[in-house]
Amino acid sequence: MLAQAERFIESQGFHLMTKDEIPKFTRCAMESYGNIVYALDDYFVGHPCTKEELWEMWLFNLKYFYSRALIYSDSPDCNAWILWIPPGCKGVSMIDFIRYGGIRLTLKLGLTTMKRIMHYEDYSASVRLKATGNSEWYLYNLVVRPEAQGQHLAGKLLRPMLEYCAQSGKPAYLETHSEKNVEIYRHFGFEVVSNDPIPGTRVTHWGMVMPKKQEVNNVK
């Protein structure tokens, strides 16, 4: 399933991330955050998240998902990129956690932070399972460099895979913790299916689904 989606994305003119480009994609993600405060990251670390802590989290995610997810950018310059987890993907095993830098991540962020991340991942997975039955293409990340914003790159990256999901009869799913983002994704046809605080926090978790075979809104 992943290989078929990768062939489709390449046919649309997008650039698939290579293993050597993981640091480049991580830098793009870091730049996309800029000085924006994300409540979820602050919850993970228990204080305003530093750039060093954010770097470690992004780097681990991209190393882990490199061979498991669909990760592509607008071009080799990587002004924007997106990560989709294919249907049926399971959580991180202990062996893979260690293999892709989990010990380093724990040493850098601390055991308490790792417990918070696992608490969130368990909650997120339960919400997603209820919404889609684990049959979805899961939009895990979408980032755009600040200097590239306003060029409609987010829509450019999103639309082909939304069409792919519709044609293959699979729902598309995402989650966000920003009310502003909820309105943005509604323009693409996503519907809110959950809107609750993450247990034990004040961080609101929106789960959004684009139902099977729904026409993709042609917005920039």
Residue ranges and their predicted role:
Residues 12-35:
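A short beta-loop-alpha structural element at the N-terminal edge
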Residues 36-58:
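Conserved GNAT-fold acetyl-CoA-binding loop/helix
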Residues 50-73, 79-80, 134, 138:
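A short helix-loop-beta-strand connector motif used in the catalytic cores of GNAT acetyltransferases and
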Residues 81-143, 149, 199:
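Conserved acyl-donor/pantetheine-binding loop and adjacent beta-alpha core of acyl/acetyltransferases
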Residues 135-137, 164-177:
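Conserved GNAT acetyl-CoA-binding A-motif
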Residues 140-149, 173-182, 199-203, 210-212:
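Conserved beta-strand-loop-alpha-helix junction that forms the acyl-donor binding cleft
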Residues 144, 150-163:
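Conserved acetyl-CoA-binding loop-helix of GNAT-fold acetyltransferases
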Residues 167-169, 178-195, 201:
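Conserved active-site alpha-helix within GNAT-family acetyltransferase domains
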